[in-house]
Amino acid sequence: MMTILIADDEPAIVDLVRFTLEDPHVQIVDAADGAAAVEVARRERPDVALLDVQMPRLNGLDVCRQLRRLPECAHTRIVMLTAAAQAADRRRGLEAGADHYLTKPFSPLALLTLVRALVPEASVWPAR
């Protein structure tokens, strides 16, 4: 089973991402702030972490840096999923250790395709 962490303080975004990626082969966990995201990641060891940049308590860039230092998250693929769309924002996300950077608003199909490409286990999902 694949585990995906959604870290975003906007419930509507969490719901959209959950709906997009929901599958019997996928466990989805979420966190509404950056500090909680680090704790959930430490406990759940997600295969993919989708991080908003602008979150309370700890921003997504700092969450990304912390996850990269955790041995239990060494395998985690990190996607910054954020409204910060400038080239400098993208550069900061990738420099923080993200594997990919997807801006809001995003296409649900683009998100699903990206997650499938990032994680080989995603191939167990049937085509929609």
Segments from the language model and where they lie:
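Active-site beta3 strand of CheY-like receiver
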Residues: 44-50
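Receiver (REC) domain active-site loop signature in two-component systems and cognate sites
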Residues: 55
